Amino acid sequence: MSKKKSNSGLRFQPAGGNRTPQVPVGKKQRLDIERLAGDGRGIAFLDGRTWFVSGALAGEAVEARVLNARGKVVEARLERLLQAAPERREAPCRYYDRCGGCNLQHLPHEAQLALKQRTLAEQLQRVAGVQPEAWAAPLSGPEFGYRRRARVAVRWDVKARQLEVGFRAEASQDIIAIDDCAVLVQPLQSILRHLPTVLRSLSKPQALGHVELFSGTAEAVLVRHVAPLPAEDQARLQAFCEQANAQLWLQGEGEPAPVDPAAQLGFALAPWQLELAWRPGDFVQVNAQVNTAMIEQALAWLAPQADERVLDLFCGLGNFALPLARQAREVVAVEGVQAMVDRAAANARNNNVHNARFFQADLSQPLAGTGWAAEGFSAVLLDPPRDGAFEVVQGIARLKARRLVYVSCNPATLARDAQVLVGQGYRLKRAGILDMFPQTAHVEAMALFEAG
């Protein structure tokens, strides 16, 4: 059946009425950037839409290319700088405009810290309706040369019949060939510089998955492989690692294992004369200097006395529990993963720490019903993952702790949990950022709560 043409000039609209047409991907648009979002992108407003522009700073006029548009939100990338902000700097890294590892190198370090502090303050105010009674100065270390672990992407290009080695591009699976990374600690920079050559020299590069680099009490290279490595390739990798004074670890279908069974990875906590052993796959803070400063601040805020019992929730390998045990009468440390509990307990034994007890518990559930939770504590330390500690803090007042330090890698969940703690009678005494990841917008924070 034929349809008559309409002469009204109106286009057909789907059910729901008139809709604003979407901004096409790839379109270039001139924008005036008004402020920075918490993730470091510039924010602009145009035609009723909010634009998020990566690489742009507040006060700049830019030409941006649309990457994605949905509803009233447009994501874009800086294409051309029309008017630069006075604080803009030339990114120190020559790969910065392509690599996805860093996103704030164009912003001076002091301004990065101010952005992170503002992000934390806004989350606390917006979500919890609170501000700390006092702000702590940001905990920060070197802005470059701080990262003690890295994951190197590896992919066999079937068409070109060559191995790609490097870091992922921003929001992409593309691999950027990089032989120098300014945020890595020096020993890993040296390994990274020569790694692509040795990987491409292997007889079966198609067998490679990805490679991880670690630095601590020793350096290590972990090679993940999706098919068995020929003996000659393993020997070549071993020779490379020996020349780099690094351990070689391999991982096929099972757990990572060192080629030398006696090899161990560890990191030192010098102020407490501790050395913690760990394995690839375990959570370890990437920034050694800020990690030490973070522990020192947590202990200063908690101020555990020699006659007090302290609870450490989400204890991991014992990063906080063992230093706490140097000051408190007893530390009870709890972690959700049994393998981590076992390693934390082993770390305590190996460091002659005898006043710390370790337990496994599902910390996504309330604490009620656990024997160790019924014992009572003077102070509590929480260091949860990004999801926060919502279930745990629901009934934390029953522990009768006077002081509580919350270490967070997500200001949004910290603010959510702070609202619960304030509702239970705790006061937010102090808060501040931990600059664990300079040159990125990632915010870590610490907050001190006191009862009554």
Curated annotation (Swiss-Prot):
TRAM domain mapped to chain residues: 22-80
Enzyme class: transferase
Highest taxon of the lineage: Bacteria
Keyword set includes Endoplasmic reticulum: no
Catalytic machinery residues: 409
Renumbered residue ranges of the record's region Disordered: 1-25
Annotated [4Fe-4S] cluster binding sites: 93, 99, 102, 181
Keyword set, alphabetical order: 4Fe-4S, Iron, Iron-sulfur, Metal-binding, Methyltransferase, rRNA processing, S-adenosyl-L-methionine, Transferase
Recorded GO MF terms: 4 iron, 4 sulfur cluster binding; iron ion binding; RNA binding; rRNA (uridine-C5-)-methyltransferase activity
Family matches, as HAMAP family: 23SrRNA_methyltr_RlmD (MF_01010)
UniProt-listed InterPro entries: 23S_rRNA_MeTrfase_RlmD, MeTrfase_TrmA_AS, MeTrfase_TrmA_CS, NA-bd_OB-fold, SAM-dependent_MTases_sf, TRAM_dom, U5_MeTrfase_fam
UniProt function note: Catalyzes the formation of 5-methyl-uridine at position 1939 (m5U1939) in 23S rRNA.
Stated family: Belongs to the class I-like SAM-binding methyltransferase superfamily. RNA M5U methyltransferase family. RlmD subfamily.
EC number: 2.1.1.190
Annotated protein name in UniProt: 23S rRNA (uracil(1939)-C(5))-methyltransferase RlmD
Any one biological process term the GO annotation gives: rRNA base methylation
Reaction(s) this enzyme catalyzes, per UniProt: uridine(1939) in 23S rRNA + S-adenosyl-L-methionine = 5-methyluridine(1939) in 23S rRNA + S-adenosyl-L-homocysteine + H(+)
Alphabetized Pfam families for the sequence: TRAM (PF01938), tRNA_U5-meth_tr (PF05958)
Binding of S-adenosyl-L-methionine, residues: 285, 314, 319, 335, 362, 383
